[in-house]
């Protein structure tokens, strides 16, 4: 059918020509351009290295099918169970995985249209833009936006870091994301998208990624608004320091017998050896580098390297100027439950998970792995219902709150308050609807990750058997998200009768509940619990110094050192641009 090619499905980008495909959606067709390469494959000697833009290709590239998923750990906790399998890779694994997908209305928009860019979660060790739950056709058809989603390197491939080395500088998974954002700036206009109106959105580690781009100046100019769903860059799991990053990288090397001979070689030899190891070997040993038995902790994550991140996320948030930024943030009703079945004693999806007091105490140590004895005591004190200190259902729910508050709700609340206080316009939500189709048990409530299917409009697909109310609810949510992408405000511009979603401020702390009922405005995102995590616990720790003296000094030193290094780097860059450097 060469002569009858649909011109709507042929697009020319900087790298060359693309052929997409037309897809049916409820309400009309959309165009999809799947598996567009944006980066040279990071294979062989390029493993662990920062990305290089894709070189141009000849002819018309076929962009009609998803490409490989980045090499990653595959979850085998409950084989064949829908609740875990939906997050597992749905394409073959490969290190040659740096492709992105673009969904656009059919026919293409004639005037520049706001762009939504999705960053998937998965603890920085897993995830893919091709998962069914991120299917772009419903949102694009319903709201007429352009949607882009990239793959990025995860696990050891994306986040192995030997600080100071060129061979494994760390954070290359975030640099993959940044390169995709640069690709959007250069190419999205060809799809009808507006490069001057780009909204990043992501969930969990994807939301943490969105936040890290907010805090990294070279990324900041590549987008205009941000949505953080159930994750934040200041979460205790989202970054590590350079010392811990090096410890994990060298331990991984030891586990895969690098360098052979066992003598501690230099970084260059170590990385050269790691590059010879099959991808699966690295994945197989990935989890063994964590410092403690823990849940909601991941081995290879972004590192505070003084480059992508000039300081800790918390310090950057506190120091930042966020004038003119619009942000939408939120959490689900039961952030902690999903993680408990992955290692908290006494928990399973196949029973009520009633736990004993002893299991609760042990669970706190796994759920707050870095806590001193005293800090763990404080957590137990705060979360015990002292009228019913042995009640198994209450203890189960309390441990879920510990894990959810510590890792998601309170970091998100802290971020929202700081951004609002420093000039951003912030909208906040709690997502409270448990899908009628959910396969996880009732005690898990509305688990981490289960708002996504509604934001992407899956209930519009009749074969998925959602209810009519859920279909209407999904349409409402897509409208909020798309309004936010268009204007920076989720409210309907034309409909003053609809209940209004007010901005979140540090003082009033207003947020909305998202469920099948109309919007309801509430105040305080778990304000009491978050005062414990965000105000009291840090004081307790600095007073008792489980941050032993050495670490406290190290932290103070690091602040001095990082500002000195930034100064030195500027001086050196200035010097190296002078003539005398080139003819040595």
Swiss-Prot record:
GO terms for cellular component: extracellular space; plasma membrane; synapse. Its EC number is 3.1.1.7. GO terms for biological process: acetylcholine catabolic process; choline metabolic process. CDD domains: Esterase_lipase (cd00312). It is a peripheral membrane protein. It comes from the Eukaryota. InterPro entries: AB_hydrolase_fold, AChE-related_enzymes, AChE_tetra, CarbesteraseB, Carboxylesterase_B_AS, Carboxylesterase_B_CS, Cholinesterase. SUPFAM superfamilies: alpha/beta-Hydrolases (SSF53474). PROSITE patterns: CARBOXYLESTERASE_B_1, CARBOXYLESTERASE_B_2. It holds the Pfam family AChE_tetra. Disulfide bonds join 70-97, 258-273, 410-530. The active site is at 204 (acyl-ester intermediate), 335 (charge relay system), 448 (charge relay system). The keyword ATP-binding does not apply. Glycans are attached at residues 266, 351, 465. Homotetramer; composed of disulfide-linked homodimers. Interacts with PRIMA1. The interaction with PRIMA1 is required to anchor it to the basal lamina of cells and organize into tetramers. Terminates signal transduction at the neuromuscular junction by rapid hydrolysis of the acetylcholine released into the synaptic cleft. Synapses usually contain asymmetric molecules of cholinesterase, with a collagen-like part disulfide-bonded to the catalytic part. A different, globular type of cholinesterase occurs on the outer surfaces of cell membranes, including those of erythrocytes. This is Acetylcholinesterase.
